Amino acid sequence: MEELLERVFSFSDVDKLIDFISYELQKPVILESADFFLLAYNSYYINHFDSANQQTIFSKKCPVQIFERFLKDGIIEKLKTEPEPFRVNKIESIGLNQRVVVSAKHKGEVMGYIWIQELDQNLTDEELDFLYETSFHVGKIIYKTNKLKQEKEEKAEDLIKRAIYQQFTSEKELRREAERINTVLPSMFSVVILHAANGDGEAVEDLKENIRSYLNLRDKVSHVLTIESNIVIVVASFSQKSSVSSAASEFINKLLTHFHFQKIPTPIYIGIGNEYNHLLKLGKSYTEALEVIKAAEITGNQENIPYEYAKLGIYRYLESIEQKNEFLEYENKDLALLKAKDEESSTELLKTLEIYLLNNCKTKPAAEQLFIHQNTLNYRIKQITEMTSIDLSDFRTRCQLYLDLMLMKKK
């Protein structure tokens, strides 16, 4: 193997190196970058590329549906953490045959991924060792190529930050600067913020990189950056015919479906700013997304807080109301009574009241949401009205109660 490795280390061109690996192993090889774009490929027999390989080659990147499946199955996470080659079993639904993959690293950082389709015979232990040793040289070559790309990404991030902080006097000035650094800016956009409630640990940074990879595979128009420990995503579109708001909502749904939030040891709050077609409104959309985050922080969760600022409604006033309540040392005595009763008797009167109010005081949907019988709900509501001075027939009382319930959650 030493002689083979000497040959490997003599290569400085990644295409020639992948050709050599494919020839020696006599198997199809795909090399992708850390953000899953095609860098090089070769097959000892050209017809041996499976459907997944073919899709990657034709589109010059990992297809989104394959990336989503890898996220769901934990393969993306394993690529980031597993140092040695590992097998990925056949997945017929995405046209993927069994293969071995190893991360190509340089100085501990993942530069890309080497995929070897195993076909009829599995790689031997010696071949796996060869692949592992080779991966570091592949990582080194990619690293040298990536330097210029990284500088460009940093310039693009800085441009977006300056736009968010409203440091440009006109859109013409902003577009001129984008053209100078060769950065594509959208025709329409919406700012999405992901906020980790208790800091910005390593897991959150990994999440940011996965989001960046996903968005790059999707459209290469959107931008992902970090501002004050928030993951900030500019969900974008070239065309004013397509709805960015719908794209942002769809992106959040994909995020919740495929990205493993449960592995992040802190709550993640999500905010979506309004859609705009004027680049100087980036800061406004960003501020709107932050308003959603603040509302979720005040209530301690996002159970009832919508992601979209446009749907935030009365929740946008929670921060102002909270500040005024603190100044006046206000406390809703009726809710305090119910809270004390819940703690004393393990009842769920506060939760019952909240769900009842959310359902416009309609018994059937409220009971269904609480998973209790309507008679049980009626009994609880009777308890609440008998214990307190609450008049649920009064609209203003219902509004006040609901706001006070939301603010009570933070305590």
Swiss-Prot record:
Which Gene Ontology BP annotations are present?
positive regulation of DNA-templated transcription
Q: Which of UniProt's keywords are assigned here?
A: Activator, DNA-binding, Transcription, Transcription regulation
The GO terms describing molecular function are: DNA binding; DNA-binding transcription factor activity
Q: Name one Pfam family in it.
A: HTH_30
- Output the InterPro entries linked to this UniProt entry: CdaR-like_regulators, CdaR_GGDEF, PucR_C-HTH_dom, PucR_C-HTH_sf
Q: Does the keyword Cytoplasm apply?
A: no
Q: What induces it?
A: PrcR expression is not subject to autoregulation and proline induction.
The Swiss-Prot or TrEMBL record describes its family as follows: Belongs to the CdaR family.
PANTHER family, per the entry: CARBOHYDRATE DIACID REGULATOR, DNA-BINDING TRANSCRIPTIONAL ACTIVATOR ADER
What's the stated role of this polypeptide?
Activates transcription of the putBCP operon. Requires proline as a coactivator.
Would you tell me the protein name for this molecule? Answer: Proline-responsive transcriptional activator PutR
Originating species: Bacillus subtilis (strain 168)
